[in-house]
Structures are given as structure tokens and as C-alpha cells.
């Protein structure tokens, strides 16, 4: 391989891409990785080992510390034809070299891989500030300054757009361990894109860390891009996750795609940028089946992405965390983020986030249908707003260490949780607000399902990763037990119980109060010009039903034997509306089967 050949490859990729997609802008980027994973690097490990941090791989290789300085050498570089002067900051050298390299070879952007610019030990929870036992806040200011200076020095020399990989951890863990000032980096107009979700779910089954970490990094954004990355193949490490990590199951599509953020204006946003790692496998093959099989799920996940705040919203203090010098807060954010990670792994369906700064700008109407989750607020205004929302009937959960919780007096509609309690404490606390999620596991050591719930078009969409398919999951929500479309639910003491496959994605528009029996919910052919959907619900035994139509559409209930017949409208159902749950039909003492009909036309007068 030569630079001339590489430049030709870049040019060919753009030309062929333009032929295939005439209306698209074809960009080709280059990667820089901090370790030895992707390429042999004489520069890192022979000429300039002084830039390698403390973390080692197999006691031989380490990761580049972006805050390091270079010793002098006499090699010829594009940006330094006479060699590198002693004491040159790595950020300056890297920026100048990148500008020359990307320009000369025709690249359009640079991808900073595996945590470069954030940490020199991106997979660890220890670092320059936290050694695993003690925090060293006296090192914080220098660590923050050095990291931020890398970005400023690099950007001074390199004009190309940057995309980032980030670490596998969260904003709070990265700050507590290494002093990563992510809020300052985002706010500095550096022309970077926020890191995408990590591949930790695929690599070690830790969906909680993937989901939690991603939410902390996208509660604020440096630009308009909200990325989602799917781990399809790996061109370096021999695995193709669609088959050998996901078992052909789309769980790592639907769960991260269920994540949403609420921006400063109170609007719900979902991923708008798709990254695929990668289209080719380690042998250079591009098998069609690895595109054709997950593609429908990617499209469906986009179709079902949230358009309103989820039932549970996390208020995350990115700015407060990453500008703090308080040793006790370092411990707080570290323990708190781990607690949320563990709670998600325990089945808490948390998939919506906003920053505390954005939260203060929002009207109460944004959160009418949600339960709010927050660490003990550092900003008194956040605590006062939480109290105000609680006084209006909105549930609030505040978590922290015992010491921090002492500063928060108890108030109505609020649960306080100690982060050093068992991980199931958060899931169990949801019952105080009418949400019961329980598991029947064949062995105590079995990992519970990971669940995401998104709200779209007046429905809830459940996304599930079930680590063990012998586990039963039972739900009971404030409006009744959720009945998922395309499923049968065994009713146990008023809860709907399911035995999920490895990965599930289900729509929910039906909630039921019924003690026992088996309730089935299946889509039926509407066979009707007036109604575009007919959902058959059977197995009803003196049940109370609450049915949520698509936003703004006419809805009715028919008791006809089949949809081929003219609908027989059921007058026992009444249209209702309340601020906490929206618009729905309610019927009581219903037995047998019904058809839930959803209209074809939008009703301008319908209550949303």
C-alpha cells in the first residue's frame, strides 16, 4: 500500500458512490486509533512510546494519551519535514499531520477511534483521578485543562470535521476517573459529533452500560447529529455480531433506537444519523444476508421511534457533573451512573433523557405522562422544579448516596433511593407510581430482561433483550396490564405475563384489568373503507379495557364475529381523556372478544 494507491481508492469510492446514489453527498473519512488493534504502529510503540498512557494490553502495548508531549525526532513528516521539535504537544502534531494527510489524499473527515481525546484508558473505570480506591480532586484541574487543550490545539491545526467514538463508560464515570470535561468540549464549537452508542451490549452482554452511557452523552449535543451505530461486522476482530453475538436477533437495534432525548425547547428527538460497523467482515466479504436480515428491523425501529417523552425520563446533570471540583460529587456521579446501569440491566425501562439545564426551560406539560428520575440535584432550581412537578401529581425519584440524600427532605410523590442499595431497588420503587415489573426466573443468577419503552403516536413500544428465554416477565401499569400486539398474555393476579424471545419489539395500545386467564391480541384484516386497522382482543373475562387509538384518529369497538361482517358497535365503550394518559376508549365488564377499530382519516376535532 502506498499513499498514491490509497488516494486512488478514496477517489474511486466517491466516484462509484456518486454513480450509485446520484443525489447523495458521498464522504470518505479516515480513522485514527489510540491503540494497537487496527494497525502496526512504529510511530506509537518504537519512535514515541512517551505518548503511551499507563494502561497496557498483554503487558506490551498501551493507548495513546492525547494530552502527552512528544520528544524530538529527526524523521521526515508531511507537517514536520525536519522532524518533531522537543516538547511538541501531541494535539498540535496530530492536528498538523491530519490536515496534511486528509487534504493530500482526498478525505472528508476524521474519525477518532476508541476514546481518543477523552481518555487514555477508555474501557476502564479508573484513571488519573480515581485509582479504584481513592479520588484525587487535586489532580482534576490539570487533567481537565490538558484534555481540553488537546481539542483546542488539534482544532487550531486541523479544519476537517471530526466524528468520535468516545469511551464505553458514561459522562459521570469518565469525569470521576479521568476528568473528561465533556460539557466544555461540546460547548467549544469544535465541529465534532457526539459519540454513538458503544458496542458493549454485543461484546459483553452489558446493555445497561450501552444504554446508560449513551443517554449521558446525548442529553446535550455539540451539533444537530444524534448518532446510532449498529455493530454488524468487524473487519479486524473476527466476528459478525448479527450471527455470532446477537443470534440473528434485533435486540441491539431496537433497544438503542428506543432511546430519545428532550431538547431545550421540549421537543423529543431520536437518532438521526446511522453508522454501520461495518459492511465487510474480517475476510473482506460483504454477505448479502447480513444486510437483508437486519435491514427491516432498522427501518422498523426508525418508524417506531419516539415522538413524545417516555414513561420514565432521566434528568442528567452533564454541566454540573463535568464542571465540579467537589470530591464528594466525584464519588456521587461514579456511584450514581453505575446504579442506573445496574438498574437498566435489572429491567428498569429507562430510555429517555434530558439535561438538567434543558429541564429548567421546560413547561410542566412536557412531563405530564412521565415519571422523573434524577440524582440529588446540585442546582437548587432543579430540586424546586421537581417539587413543583410532584405537587402537580408527577412522580419523582431522586437517587444518591446516604450523605447526599440527607440534604433532600421528603415530599409527596417522591421516592428517595440509596445508590448503594441492591440494583432491584429502583425497579421495585416504580410500584409506588403504579408500575410493577417482575420476573419469574428459573435460577436466581439468571440475568433479567433489558427493556426499553418509547412513546409514539399515542402508544407505547416495548423493546426487549431477554438474556434467558425461560424467564417470564409480568407487567402492571397505572392504566392496567399492558397487552402487547401480536402476543398472548397469561393474566396472573392482574398482571400480564410474557415469555419473550431473545429480542422483541412490540406495540402496546391495550391495557386491561383482569385477574386471570389468557388474553390474546392479534392484528386482523380490517375489510372496511372507514377503518384502517382492526385489532382482535380475545380471552376477556369481565375485564376493564382501555384502548389507545393512533393520534387524532377515529376509534370504535365492534363485537362482530369477524371483520368480514359490518361492525357491530359496542356502546359500553366511552371516549375519555386525562392529562396523565391522554385519549383512550374505556369499557367495563367485557367478556369474550372484541375488535378495536382505528379510523383511516385524521379527526381534526380528536383529542390527542
What are these regions (language model features)?
Residues 1-371, 375, 379-391, 398-431, ...:
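Glycan-processing catalytic domains of CAZymes
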Residues 592-608:
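Short, aromatic- and glycine-rich surface loops/edge beta-strands on solvent-exposed regions
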Residues 374-570, 574-586, 606-608:
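A conserved amphipathic helix/loop scaffold
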Amino acid at each position: 500500500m502506498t499513499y498514491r494507491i490509497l488516494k486512488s481508492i478514496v477517489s474511486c469510492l466517491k466516484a462509484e458512490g456518486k454513480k450509485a446514489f446520484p443525489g447523495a453527498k458521498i464522504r470518505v473519512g479516515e480513522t485514527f486509533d489510540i491503540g494497537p488493534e487496527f494497525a502496526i504502529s512504529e510511530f506509537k510503540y518504537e519512535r514515541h512510546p512517551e505518548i503511551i498512557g499507563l494502561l497496557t494490553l498483554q503487558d506490551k502495548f498501551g493507548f495513546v494519551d492525547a494530552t502527552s508531549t512528544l520528544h524530538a525526532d529527526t524523521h521526515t513528516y508531511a507537517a514536520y519535514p525536519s522532524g518533531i521539535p522537543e516538547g511538541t504537544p501531541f494535539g498540535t502534531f496530530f492536528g498538523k499531520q491530519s490536515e496534511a494527510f486528509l487534504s493530500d489524499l482526498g478525505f472528508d473527515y476524521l474519525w477518532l477511534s476508541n476514546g481518543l481525546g477523552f481518555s487514555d484508558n477508555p474501557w476502564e473505570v479508573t484513571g488519573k483521578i480515581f485509582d479504584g480506591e481513592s479520588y484525587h480532586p487535586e489532580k482534576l484541574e490539570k487533567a481537565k485543562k490538558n484534555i481540553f487543550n488537546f481539542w483546542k490545539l488539534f482544532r487550531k491545526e486541523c479544519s476537517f470535521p471530526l466524528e468520535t467514538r468516545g469511551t464505553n463508560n458514561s459522562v459521570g464515570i469518565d469525569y470521576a476517573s479521568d476528568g473528561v470535561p465533556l460539557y466544555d468540549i461540546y460547548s467549544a464549537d469544535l465541529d465534532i459529533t457526539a459519540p454513538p452508542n458503544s458496542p458493549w451490549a454485543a461484546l459483553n452482554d452489558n446493555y445497561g452500560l450501552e444504554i446508560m452511557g449513551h443517554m449521558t452523552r446525548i442529553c446535550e449535543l455539540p451539533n444537530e447529529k444524534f448518532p446510532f451505530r449498529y455493530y454488524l461486522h468487524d473487519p479486524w476482530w473476527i466476528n459478525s455480531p448479527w450471527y455470532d453475538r446477537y443470534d440473528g436477533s434485533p435486540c441491539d437495534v431496537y433497544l438503542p433506537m428506543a432511546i430519545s432525548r428532550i431538547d431545550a425547547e421540549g421537543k423529543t428527538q431520536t437518532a438521526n444519523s446511522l453508522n454501520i460497523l461495518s459492511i465487510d467482515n474480517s475476510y473482506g466479504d460483504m454477505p448479502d444476508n447480513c444486510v437483508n436480515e437486519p435491514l427491516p428491523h432498522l427501518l422498523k425501529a426508525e418508524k417506531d421511534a419516539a415522538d413524545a417523552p417516555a414513561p420514565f425520563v432521566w434528568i442528567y446533570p452533564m454541566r454540573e457533573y463535568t464542571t465540579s471540583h467537589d470530591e464528594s460529587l466525584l464519588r456521587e456521579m461514579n456511584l450514581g451512573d453505575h446504579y442506573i446501569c445496574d438498574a437498566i440491566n435489572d429491567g428498569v425501562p429507562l430510555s429517555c433523557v434530558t439535561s438538567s439545564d434543558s429541564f429548567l426551560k421546560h413547561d410542566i406539560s412536557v412531563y405530564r405522562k412521565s415519571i422523573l428520575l434524577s440524582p440529588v440535584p446540585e442546582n437548587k432550581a432543579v430540586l424546586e422544579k421537581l417539587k413543583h412537578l410532584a405537587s402537580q401529581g408527577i412522580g419523582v425519584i431522586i437517587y444518591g448516596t446516604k450523605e447526599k440524600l440527607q440534604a433532600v427532605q421528603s415530599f409527596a410523590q417522591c421516592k428517595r433511593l440509596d445508590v448503594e442499595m441492591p440494583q432491584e431497588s429502583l425497579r421495585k420503587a416504580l410500584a409506588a407510581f403504579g408500575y410493577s415489573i417482575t420476573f419469574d426466573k428459573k435460577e436466581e443468577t439468571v440475568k433479567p430482561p433489558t427493556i426499553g419503552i418509547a412513546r409514539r403516536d399515542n402508544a407505547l413500544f416495548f423493546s426487549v433483550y431477554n438474556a434467558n428465554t425461560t424467564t417470564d416477565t409480568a407487567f402492571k401499569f397505572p392504566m392496567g396490564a399492558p397487552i402487547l400486539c401480536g402476543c398472548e398474555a397469561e393474566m396472573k393476579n392482574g398482571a400480564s405475563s410474557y415469555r419473550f424471545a431473545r429480542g422483541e419489539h412490540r406495540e402496546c395500545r391495550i391495557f386491561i384489568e383482569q385477574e386471570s386467564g389468557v388474553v390474546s391480541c392479534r392484528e386482523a384484516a380490517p375489510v372496511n373503507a372507514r377503518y384502517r386497522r382492526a385489532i382482535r382482543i380475545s380471552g376477556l373475562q369481565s375485564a376493564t379495557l382501555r384502548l389507545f387509538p393512533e393520534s387524532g384518529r377515529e376509534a370504535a369497538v365492534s363485537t362482530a364475529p369477524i371483520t368480514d361482517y359490518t361492525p357491530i358497535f359496542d356502546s359500553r365503550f366511552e371516549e375519555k381523556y386525562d392529562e396523565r394518559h391522554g385519549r383512550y376508549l374505556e369499557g367495563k365488564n367485557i367478556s369474550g372478544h372484541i375488535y378495536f377499530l382505528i379510523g383511516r382519516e385524521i379527526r381534526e376535532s380528536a383529542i390527542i
